[in-house]
Amino acid sequence: MLDLKRIRNNSNEIKEALNNRGEKFDVTVIDEVLKLDEERRNILVKVEVLKSKRNQVSSEVPKLKKEGKDVSNIVAEMKNLSEEIKGFDTTLAKIDEKIQYIMLRIPNIPNPQVPDGETDEDNIEIRNWSEPTKFDFEPKAHWDIGSNLNILDFERAGKVTGSRFTFYKGLGARLERSLISYFLDTHTEKHGYTEILPPYMVNRTSMIGTGQLPKFEEDAFKISEDDYFLIPTAEVPVTNLYRDEILKGDELPLKHVAYSACFRSEAGSAGRDTRGLVRQHQFNKVELVKFTKPEQSYEELEKLTNDAETVLKELGIPYRVVRICKGDLGFTAALKYDLEVWMPSYNRYVEISSCSNFEDFQARRANIRYKEDAKAKPQYVHTLNGSGVAIGRTVAAILENYQNEDGSVTIPEVLRPYMGGKEAIK
């Protein structure tokens, strides 16, 4: 959520920034918010005048009673003033509700570092690691490799559940589990994150706090009778861990890593990446989440991105880092990097992690603040997160980049201790 004061003082700048985003956004709502805000402030002035008058009248009652005078007219006046104030309070509550409704639907403002552009074709590559994998045979797609090795079963998952689900079997399940452990061990032991195992269901307030609701409700799996949602990412429960709390300044930055299953309807992705592990309704992911002071957040974003890159380097998977343009930025981020791994079957790079700085956008929605000391005024933290990284897509990248002509797959060396010392899946 944006700062209403920022909108009030920089409305034209805010409109221009919102116009430059890719998603179509009606900037006239900014004028609507400002009109409601002005109406609200005018009513508050009137309420203060009425309260002052009521207090003044109220202070006269004891004196008049002591003098034996009739106070019925004054009591009646106090009652009328109270009723008038009550009416204004009702109006204010309705105005606040309207303002909140609009504010929750206004996207974040891009940081000045975000490049111009409308689609993912306008994203800018800022670095890459290793050359795309070359083969002296015709490489197969990961869904064929997995099926041939009997470690992935898409057909039976379709029978049991439906499309975009997978059974991992044998060494496929072992590979998935090994990646989860390797990612968690790396981020806790090498990078200093505290491990969290979160709930896989959250309430509506939590989804609003991180920005999934109200805009993306159609993309979420909902348990209607309880108004719970299956989490689309561990970002949601881990960020809301500190909702409505004031943190200590000397505790920041807080760094958490969480493994979870993730659930997405992929409502807007019909026809895209329908085969394999790239776009599933249920998948596993290790998520990195940070809470920082505002002046630290962009330095911490670079560190978080490097932390995610580390596991890809150690796995030996070719990848690149792209800076996302304004049109592809999404609803909540102020600046975002995507890590994309090379996928031979696609003959292109495929996203495996998004690393974002939300500045105070989520913190305002979730009311997460900090104080430098006991006497200091609370300030909103900046929140950051990034995949560290998506498990299923990593399995796909390993199967495709480490495949051999005989149909086997070499296991990356860093994973072999987790795979019982095995060197290949045959």
Curated annotation (Swiss-Prot):
A single MF term (Gene Ontology): ATP binding
Pathway: Aminoacyl-tRNA biosynthesis; selenocysteinyl-tRNA(Sec) biosynthesis; L-seryl-tRNA(Sec) from L-serine and tRNA(Sec): step 1/1
Residues of the signal peptide: none
GO biological processes: selenocysteine biosynthetic process; seryl-tRNA aminoacylation
Subcellular location field: Cytoplasm
InterPro entries, sorted: aa-tRNA-synt_IIb, aa-tRNA-synth_II, aa-tRNA-synth_II/BPL/LPL, Ser-tRNA-ligase_type_1, Ser-tRNA-synth_1_N, SerRS_1_N_sf, SerRS_core, tRNA-bd_arm
Record key words, sorted: Aminoacyl-tRNA synthetase, ATP-binding, Cytoplasm, Ligase, Nucleotide-binding, Protein biosynthesis
Protein's UniProt keywords contain Ion transport: no
A Pfam family that the UniProt record links to this protein: Seryl_tRNA_N
Catalytic activity: tRNA(Ser) + L-serine + ATP = L-seryl-tRNA(Ser) + AMP + diphosphate + H(+); tRNA(Sec) + L-serine + ATP = L-seryl-tRNA(Sec) + AMP + diphosphate + H(+)
Coiled-coil region(s): none
GO cellular component: cytoplasm
SUPFAM superfamilies (alphabetical): Class II aaRS and biotin synthetases, tRNA-binding arm
Enzyme class: ligase
Family: Belongs to the class-II aminoacyl-tRNA synthetase family. Type-1 seryl-tRNA synthetase subfamily.
Quaternary structure note: Homodimer. The tRNA molecule binds across the dimer.
Domain notes: Consists of two distinct domains, a catalytic core and a N-terminal extension that is involved in tRNA binding.
The name this protein goes by in its record: Serine--tRNA ligase
Gene that encodes it: serS
